[in-house]
Amino acid sequence: MAEKTGLFISFEGGEGAGKSTQIRTLAEALRGRGFEVVVTREPGGSPGAEAVRHVILSGAAESFGVRMEAILFAAARNDHVEEVIRPALARGEIVLCDRFLDSSRVYQGTTGNLEPDFIETLQRIAIDGVVPELTLIFDIAAEKGLARARKRADEGATPDRFEKEEIETHEKRREAYLDIALAEPRRCRIVNADQPEDKVTEDVMSFVEPLLERAGNAADAAHE
């Protein structure tokens, strides 16, 4: 029997970049082609991690400081990996995750001013070898992304505390994501998020398509 191995794709980017919309679109397309797909998110994705998500995004953890917040993120990520992501990959499924390790590097590292070595040590413990085969970084000017996020809030969505931060902070995060893509070109692809939604979808699929043959083989193995 062939070894079962799924496909892990993470979606990264600043506020209002359109990640969640593209995850839903991609998941629907892949399921239509017969793939088993798990859609998940961070912080959260598992019962334990969702409890931590509420603490972090509500702002309740801010009083503990950015270092403790990074530890909370890592704890949530480890639970998510062990309870959801690793089992799904072992079943030969495709995992689409809205944010993963790069968000910690950017949000707690770059704009949280935590030492890179501290962040990387936490990540090694949290992910325990589970790294996305592909990371799609959705790039859009911070001002445009925040305008989208505000429109979403006007339509009833609850803004999280990150959306309320200064524009300069969001621009630093954009630059940090682009730096990650430059440093890890084999894993990361930049998606121009400042274009019509259907064109963004085309670009996403152009990056995902080369990986689907392997995922298809994994799905076949999972049913042997």
From Swiss-Prot:
Keyword Phosphoprotein found: no
PROSITE patterns (alphabetical): THYMIDYLATE_KINASE (PS01331)
GO molecular function, one term: dTMP kinase activity
Enzyme class: transferase
Cystines in this chain: none
Enzymatic reactions: dTMP + ATP = dTDP + ADP
GO cellular component terms, semicolon-separated: cytosol
SUPFAM superfamilies per the UniProt record, alphabetical: P-loop containing nucleoside triphosphate hydrolases (SSF52540)
Record GO biological process: dTDP biosynthetic process; dTTP biosynthetic process; dUDP biosynthetic process
EC numbers on record: 2.7.4.9
UniProt entry tagged with the keyword Transcription regulation: no
InterPro entries: P-loop_NTPase, Thymidylate_kin-like_dom, Thymidylate_kin_CS, Thymidylate_kinase
Record keywords: ATP-binding, Kinase, Nucleotide biosynthesis, Nucleotide-binding, Transferase
Protein family according to the UniProt entry: Belongs to the thymidylate kinase family.
Role summary: Phosphorylation of dTMP to form dTDP in both de novo and salvage pathways of dTTP synthesis.
HAMAP family: Thymidylate_kinase
Protein name listed in UniProt: Thymidylate kinase
Source organism: Agrobacterium fabrum (strain C58 / ATCC 33970) (Agrobacterium tumefaciens (strain C58))
Organism classification: Bacteria, Pseudomonadati, Pseudomonadota, Alphaproteobacteria, Hyphomicrobiales
Encoding gene (name): tmk
